Amino acid sequence: MVVLFSAVVYGYFWRIPRQYKITAANDAYLQKDYIRVIDSLKDFEIGQMERAQKYILATAYIQGESVDSFSTKDKEVILSKINYQSNEGIFDYWIHLGRMEVKEAENLALQMSDDQLLLYAYLQELSQIEDNQEMSGEEKSSKKQDLMKKVEELADKLHISYRETDAEMNTETNVGVD
């Protein structure tokens, strides 16, 4: 009797709501409602998601407003290099970046030895530093200088033109997520 009760409780309070959120995310993805995809899967830890959920969430973050440092054309190039068979680490990277977990994204980029992805993560971190109102001016300046040095080194290595003044990259021919 206790086992049956436990199974019912598990299904009712965990499995059914989880399946509902996954179904809602899939439906939103088909409708190209990327914000709703993100909202449906926001409570899921990366380790709890299947490959399909990771794929749709990663592409939703790229398409959505979460990754704002890219132009529409850059996003199209990035998306053209990602497919369902891509390395799951790529999906995890974009999910972390979309969730503003830049340190985790940087770590994944380093693990995959992907300088392009590392550069994107650095740019996202730079944006976070600039938007941080709680950081002292001295600390903000120091962190920005350190990060800008890393960004410029990677941009040079990747032959990407980078303008510090407006934090834009011209990545049209250099976007790579192999």
Put a short name on every predicted segment.
Residues 21-178:
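C-terminal soluble domains/tails of integral membrane proteins
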Residues 10-23:
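Transmembrane-cytosolic junction motif
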Residues 2-12:
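Hydrophobic membrane-insertion alpha-helices, especially the h-region
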